[in-house]
Amino acid sequence: MRRRDFITLIGGAAAAWPLAARAQQPQKMPLIGTLMPSPVEVSTSLDAFLQGLRDLGYIEGQNSAIERRFADWKLDRLPELAADLVRRNVDVIVAVSTPPGRAAQEATRTIPIVVGGMADPVGDGLVASLARPNGNVTGTTFIGPELIAKRLGLLKEAIPGAARIAVLWHPGVYSEYTMAQMLHETEAAARTLGLELQLLAAQGPGDFDEAFAAMRRDGADALLLFPSPMLYLEYRRVVDVAKSSRLPAIYAAREFVDAGGLMSYGANLPALFRRTATYVDKIFKGAKPADLPVEQPSKFEFVVNLQTAKALALDIPSTLLARADEVIE
């Protein structure tokens, strides 16, 4: 072999070696950080999001990895948990509901953040507008304040003799602006319907018994729940206490009614959380949160549980049942 050919051969082999080595290196799996306000065992919305990922072909441990963080309803822990996800250098943060979304936004302005189930994204300061978020945050909204008056009207129609309505809410979940909007909508609807309101706060499931005892003591005729991640994710416990208190209630999601609650009016929340996964998919394919509009639900379900109505000795008007999307008999 001539010296020139030998040098060319060695040079070509040396150049090809790094390419071959690189080809053999496994591709880095995208790392998703999830931030939940709830305990690990209360994960209805997270499960729906993970199913959405699987539907899109993202299988944990095969082509994606997930770092999970849970705040156990201690909302003051969320900033610390969000900062930990940032230190882990996750590729995207998925926050379930507004409080984790705010904590993630304060922790980073560069890592993409997808928030599932926001109440009022603009009012809570998470996005500049629904059409153009203009930051590193986007996601889905279930539309919070606007539906409260509708629920109160349905409750009054179902129980025409009701005069005093207990309102259960979770303090600190939303911004002062959004909470003021919810209160304004509720009080305005109550005045129109001739109802008196009894506002009761619950910081966590441990407050349920005391809150419902106050409702019974003060003679509440029915119950309205403000939308809240804590109340939604603890829906079985809420329904159980309401049933034992013999208090008819209207809720923001059908899961309550499936568990034995009286009525619900709102978006299909599991479907909304599954849709949240599509944002992650688009971001992994190069889209920026600033260019992805916040998605609003296009359909709202009205569900009535007639078994619960009978147990409470309530005669739901046939005109109301005719408008229900589903009646559980």
Show the residue positions of the predicted features:
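Short hydrophobic alpha-helices and adjacent helix-cap/hinge residues
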Residues: 1-329
